């Protein structure tokens, strides 16, 4: 078999930020506490970004001649009801306690609405279910998928407005003389209070009996920025939805993992709207992750699908992967969970098609962004933080520059990266990205990327970039200009508050 080579387009711009400095660079270090930004510490050692596979593809892995390659996924679990003891566990409505809800046929289960549910009985049953699906406590993800109702009253719009209507009816049954306005106010308070008790109580139970797992609810947080039909769609989360997320502070404080979703419909195929949609959903998740403790954010794992939700036979294109995976990685989250239903592997020729897609499209891009993110963390953040965009609206991505690297598949089916980073690659990181320090850690950005001598980053089955960079340019003050520079700097310092500096400043100049 011949060697298959990928020459990756560097989607969006890769700024050529290299070149010899023509001017003096004066680094004035302001107090650290004014500029620090945090992200959750990696949940796995030496793994800046975690890939999670949550697809029932056992048929594509076991007892097949050419299995799909899952070597880049650190956590693998099937969402099948029969699967237990996995590092990623997804609890649907029928797998965790006695979740009160109303099904599509309007049949009420366990009381139907939260106010009529039995919390004590629910928690007893939930404990049994957790112990069944997670028999031993070791590092893993525990995601509760309760989508029948939302804990925020106003978010239960059609068809979920049945929960509001039933709640109002409950109040009216207890007090027939009450007017509709007062009944609605009372119903809202009762519904939201009971919803909080069920969700908060379930999280506390899970954390108590399986504390090493990261507990949270699927689709939380959400910001409902999906009105794609409006003119000049900008992806921004509506202020009212951000305020509603603020009102769910009890949920964010109790969660040890956040699990938002950025699934795409086909209308967003290769679309700028998809970029903006994903961007601001992830940014809202980052904001929410800091509610409990800004210096110790909650880990964020973003759910994606490899197909369009309304056209499940069509896989995402490379541009779509950039709009989802690329956006998520560039903003500095903990990882990505790839989910899909059984049909992904059961469709006609499902496994061979999935295997080919992963081999030629998905896995090479995973290699691309993961190694770029690790290289940025190592060189810019000294491995004490992860890289995130300096500017929220930026289209900068953590990609390997195709003029420096190529990603190959060897005859043995293994991936390898050819090439080595150049100074311009590292300076691209420092120009467009900042260091978000890992929780409770002090990190300092590399001030001069030309000082980097070695790069050594790996992922998966020994897929690495190992390189020694060339000698640095010598920096010195140009003859005859030293006095002018010192005079200018002294003038600047004289007009600044005396206590602003806590670190030494550096003055670097190079010859043209």
Curated annotation (Swiss-Prot):
Native source organism of the sequence: Rattus norvegicus
Disulfide bonds: 60-351, 223-237, 376-387, 381-435, 437-464
Subcellular locations according to the entry: Cell membrane
UniProt membrane topology term: Lipid-anchor; GPI-anchor
Family membership: Belongs to the glycosyl hydrolase 56 family.
PANTHER family linked: HYALURONIDASE (PTHR11769), HYALURONIDASE PH-20 (PTHR11769:SF17)
Chemical reaction(s) catalysed: Random hydrolysis of (1->4)-linkages between N-acetyl-beta-D-glucosamine and D-glucuronate residues in hyaluronate
Primary enzyme class: hydrolase
Signal peptide interval: 1-35
Official protein name in the record: Hyaluronidase PH-20
Enzyme nomenclature, EC number: 3.2.1.35
Source species, domain of life: Eukaryota
Described function: Involved in sperm-egg adhesion. Upon fertilization sperm must first penetrate a layer of cumulus cells that surrounds the egg before reaching the zona pellucida. The cumulus cells are embedded in a matrix containing hyaluronic acid which is formed prior to ovulation. This protein aids in penetrating the layer of cumulus cells by digesting hyaluronic acid.
Gene Ontology biological process terms from the UniProt entry: carbohydrate metabolic process; cell adhesion; fusion of sperm to egg plasma membrane involved in single fertilization; hyaluronan catabolic process; single fertilization
UniProt entry tagged with the keyword ATP-binding: no
GO cellular component, one term: membrane raft
UniProt xrefs under Pfam families: Glyco_hydro_56
GO molecular-function terms, A-Z: hyalurononglucosaminidase activity
Active site per database record: 147
Keywords: Cell adhesion, Cell membrane, Disulfide bond, Glycoprotein, Glycosidase, GPI-anchor, Hydrolase, Lipoprotein, Membrane, Signal
The keyword Lipoprotein is assigned to this record: yes
Glycosylation sites per record: 63, 165, 179, 368, 408
InterPro entries: Aldolase_TIM, Glycoside_hydrolase_SF, Hyaluronidase, Hyaluronidase_PH20/Hyal5
